[in-house]
Regions:
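Phosphate-end processing signature that detects enzymes handling 5′-triphosphorylated RNA
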Residues: 1-200
Length: 200
């Protein structure tokens, strides 16, 4: 039996003025994110691009990289070529922005039609501002399903009066570690997170 809790280390790349963050903040229908991710327990590392289309569907594309390339993967041919072909931003304009670490539990139902991830002990450091932050009392749960099927977990959350809230770890980390960034549309979510932490 494998480890039940896995550790992840992620570094998001963006332009110096955080255009990918701003696109999310401004609710652009189509947007992208670029990150390097290390699956610490297996030693695997990837360059990953997340694309969200105007139908609110997110698709991820990735290629393997060396762990040693984590902090400057765009200096290497494979990642640079991949990003040039798949990302709608000039590669030379991209810099490491926000790094995060967290622990994850992954649960899959027997029919493999439902996948649940539980992220905890989330910490951030901003490579641009040098500031760091942590949300040790916050747990982010994400449910992915194949089609519109009944979900036992959704019923449990409904019974507990827990309503879904959309949140991006990149955007959360940016807001918490960059006091100069615009964050008007995230203030309500930040208040909600603070309220949750105070009630624990």
């Amino acid at each position: 039996m494998g480890k039940r809790i896995a550790h992840y280390n992620t570094l998001y790349y963006d332009t110096p003025d955080a255009q990918m963050y701003v696109a999310h903040h401004d609710r652009k229908l189509t947007r992208q994110k670029l990150r390097a991710r290390i699956y610490c327990d297996t030693g695997a590392a990837f360059c990953e691009i997340k694309n969200k289309n105007n139908k609110k569907r997110t698709k991820k594309k990735r290629i393997p990289i060396e762990v040693s390339q984590f902090g400057d993967m765009l200096a290497y041919t494979e990642a640079r070529t991949f990003v040039t072909e798949k990302l709608h931003y000039e590669v030379s304009s991209l810099i490491p922005q926000v790094e995060n670490e967290f622990d994850r539990i992954t649960l899959v139902n027997k029919g493999r039609t439902e996948r649940l991830t539980i992220d905890s002990d989330i910490r951030f450091i901003n490579r641009h501002t040098g500031l760091s932050a942590a949300v040790p009392d916050l747990v982010i749960i994400e449910l992915k399903q194949d089609g519109n099927i009944p979900s036992f977990f959704k019923r449990v959350l409904l019974a507990l009066r827990i309503k879904p809230k959309r949140i991006s770890k990149y955007c959360l980390g940016t807001v918490l570690t960059n006091p100069e960034i615009k964050a008007n549309r995230f203030k309500r979510k930040l208040r909600y997170i603070n309220k949750l932490s105070q009630n624990i």
